[in-house]
Amino acid sequence: MPQLRTFIDSGVLLAAFKAAGELAENALAVLGDAERRFVSSDFVRLELLPKPICYGNDAERLFYETFFANVEPLVQASALLVEAAEREAEAVGLSAMDALHIAAAKQAACDEFVTAEKSTKP
């Protein structure tokens, strides 16, 4: 059976690293699922890596770097991706970063998008 192409939002990775509470348990369950092939983007990297690098949190940095080393593909920023994100944001009222994540997931033909956002958010 083919693996699900799963785009992981930054909130899921942040929760998994913190490893406390129900959200963390759910995040770790998704990340530990061998039936998934993970996809991410430059934008998720930008959301997660700068602070642990700046403040010397090596454990957090290594956690994220290990994840990013194993995603396929890592969707890269491009003018076309930004245009697609703008259309997405205008169509459903997303914030800029959320729209970039959705556009990246669509560009990578993901089967699902896993986020820590509330289900009521567009």
Language model feature labels by segment:
Residues 73-119:
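Active-site neighborhoods of divalent-metal-dependent phosphate/nucleic-acid chemistry enzymes
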Residues 66, 118-122:
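Short, intrinsically disordered, charge-balanced linker/junction segments flanking boundaries
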Residues 8-9, 40-41, 94-95, 117:
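Histidine- and aromatic-rich ligand-binding microenvironments
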Residues 33-37, 70-71, 91:
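Structured helix-beta-strand junction loops
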